[in-house]
């Protein structure tokens, strides 16, 4: 009821706040026998963690995950997997000036009105720090999906502010601090971010995530359509203000003759639908994009109100990301993995004995 869990058969529940003692999560429904250890999760956590480059927040958290339960002798037992990450670099004093002040564009005001109080230190539960546990849980799902079913999930930053990736060289994504697939734009990105930090402002971004090897048939019409659950999961990431599946909002200007993905025995001719038809996976790559707003934690003064309703000026102090989209890449991968894992287990539970006589087709 309180919105801290996602999934039906593969259930992830997270807990913890930005400046609390620790973050944690419980994973229910992971099949037994999966070879798993902390290192499997640490790789993605290191991709997400703060302080890894000059383009992200200066907060330095090692984000070292500890397994509390559910793994014995290097394999999952089928019972609840408990994970924890300690917070070690809190500087709560940086937030003392907003104890009774609402930051525009943040959840300060809405949390106060909903709960009657709020943890103002780093945003408390509303902080993107919480997503560390989603990434850890997503890493578990990613390993199972790849090892058992050959499904791979890859995300990248497709646009930062006005700078768009014009080339998609997936071998370059992990070779730069931006997770950017177009190496010809890296110098431009560096210069743009340097100027942005000097100005004390922030900027939005577009993150893309692609899942390949997904079988036909995942998705539960009508209210648990695969694309609906993916959109729900991605929209639940902090700062996300829009989600696209496939061509997304570009379909507004497309004609039916242009948008439909023609089929032949050799496969689909295109993938405008993003790998999902009628809420069910088609066997093509699943493609999703998220639009992330620029963070409101900037040093440029802005008008707001106090908890007493009085007008006040806000100048945000502390350590913040000038573009939250950079560290969102592994988060988007994790959320897509969690949804696919959940739907794979649900499909297996109901449809494992289905044997369609229609040949399976892929991309031409």
UniProtKB/Swiss-Prot annotation:
It catalyses: 5-O-(1-carboxyvinyl)-3-phosphoshikimate = chorismate + phosphate. It comes from Shewanella woodyi (strain ATCC 51908 / MS32). This reaction introduces a second double bond into the aromatic ring system. The keyword Membrane does not apply. Belongs to the chorismate synthase family. Its cofactor is FMNH2. NADP(+) binds at residues 48, 54. Its EC number is 4.2.3.5. Pathway: Metabolic intermediate biosynthesis; chorismate biosynthesis; chorismate from D-erythrose 4-phosphate and phosphoenolpyruvate: step 7/7. The gene is aroC. Pfam families: Chorismate_synt (PF01264). CDD domains: Chorismate_synthase. FMN binds at residues 125-127, 238-239, 278, 293-297, 319. Reduced FMN (FMNH(2)). The keyword NADP applies. GO terms for molecular function: chorismate synthase activity; FMN binding. GO terms for biological process: amino acid biosynthetic process; aromatic amino acid family biosynthetic process; chorismate biosynthetic process. PANTHER family: CHORISMATE SYNTHASE. PROSITE patterns: CHORISMATE_SYNTHASE_1 (PS00787), CHORISMATE_SYNTHASE_2 (PS00788), CHORISMATE_SYNTHASE_3 (PS00789). HAMAP family: Chorismate_synth. This is Chorismate synthase.
